[in-house]
Amino acid sequence: MQIFVKTLTGKTITLEVEGSDNIENVKAKIQDKEGIPPDQQRLIFAGKQLEDGRTLSDYNIQKESTLHLVLRLRGGMQIFVKTLTGKTITLEVEGSDNIENVKAKIQDKEGIPPDQQRLIFAGKQLEDGRTLSDYNIQKESTLHLVLRLRGGMQIFVKTLTGKTITLEVEGSDNIENVKAKIQDKEGIPPDQQRLIFAGKQLEDGRTLSDYNIQKESTLHLVLRLRGGMQIFVKTLTGKTITLEVEGSDNIENVKAKIQDKEGIPPDQQRLIFAGKQLEDGRTLSDYNIQKESTLHLVLRLRGGMQIFVKTLTGKTITLEVEGSDNIENVKAKIQDKEGIPPDQQRLIFAGKQLEDGRTLSDYNIQKESTLHLVLRLRGGMQIFVKTLTGKTITLEVEGSDNIENVKAKIQDKEGIPPDQQRLIFAGKQLEDGRTLSDYNIQKESTLHLVLRLRGGMQIFVKTLTGKTITLEVEGSDNIENVKAKIQDKEGIPPDQQRLIFAGKQLEDGRTLSDYNIQKESTLHLVLRLRGGN
């Protein structure tokens, strides 16, 4: 009988065989035709690798069956790489390949830059300079691929014993997150960790960026012995600050710690505990202040008042102002604190935008009022893009920007090529040539980003039972590939499948593009009963 052998290059070889031929004989015939030594051949049928000692009949290989030929590199092996989306990639590697080589192979297959790849095996992150053999990665091992979004980085944490821990972090991680990562690695509870950078103790609520901690910075980890304690300071706004103190700290020290956290000068602070105002020269122990006690902070303002400014990110800034301050002064104070130029600030109170020449009193802004700060782009606006991982990206855009421009901005921020991005707004996929205004996308609208695998698309296959299967395909896939994907999902052998589109039966050797099958097209699957035509 005749059988076909399909290579990874897409070439199909025809062989004359008997059902009683064993797999070694078949490999010898392939060697005669193609010159490929048997020990470099792996034959696959119905998803299974065929063993040399077995016969074609053992595997129920019949006339006109198609086997798949995969080359096994000398000393080489196959390993699998599983992504967070559940997709599994097969790679041909050598044990001597280093991790950089492996990342380059993944880039060839998937288009993901190596610097955005983190590979995990047996719970360990693999380092670029090491080889697969160093990690005892053997044939058919599975690695896990995690994407490191741009803005991710490594930092080091050095303990008093001299041990150095490596952590994967984002600049936006707060110190609590970092302590939790240290707990995961080392088992040290966060409340016993003190982290020091550039001589300063890092506070839980602040982020790495707040301290200008950049990639490959080294933090120092000091264990906090019980004997130090935490106390709380509650402000009139209801905000609670946590301080690390000793019973022997005097009240001046405590006010200095509050200044470090909140920027309030000690001479404007009054601290109250158990109804008493605390005096600078006395200690916490003098007042019997113990761990987890709560002090109350009252501000002593010179004819001034505090107001709050809330940003779109949810951050609240506290400003010291006078009712007679004009809006320009207020913007200048915000620039001092946050570095945002006044001409990019819009301040909103009670739904009204505040004008530079007017004063706070003109708008009846009183102590502890909250203003809202919106950034004004020159002629532009901010929109948000939410990814499937739940991350939200902020983009500066113009209504006249077309969707291609927006995808380019996302590539700048996240490194995702535009051809892998699908943007959805109000349930519609956005087309490259149209503008944001065409879709009535306005300031602070949220788009949703879905990743499209390279050149890939989804199609649907509907069975006679009414079940619909979703497949990830490329336009260049031939009908055999599609039937193999259906076999993977549903277990139906390709030779029992007939696929119909637009009333036509699809032929194995043709591609989806040949039939003008586009994304989200629906094919119909009809079963061909054995012994039938």
UniProtKB/Swiss-Prot annotation:
Belongs to the ubiquitin family. GO terms for molecular function: protein tag activity; ubiquitin protein ligase binding. Residues 1-76, 77-152, 153-228, 229-304, 305-380, 381-456, 457-532 form the Ubiquitin-like domain. SUPFAM superfamilies: Ubiquitin-like. It is found in: Cytoplasm; Nucleus. Keywords: Cytoplasm, Isopeptide bond, Nucleus, Repeat, Ubl conjugation. This is Polyubiquitin-F. It comes from Dictyostelium discoideum (Social amoeba). Pfam families: ubiquitin. GO terms for biological process: modification-dependent protein catabolic process; protein ubiquitination.
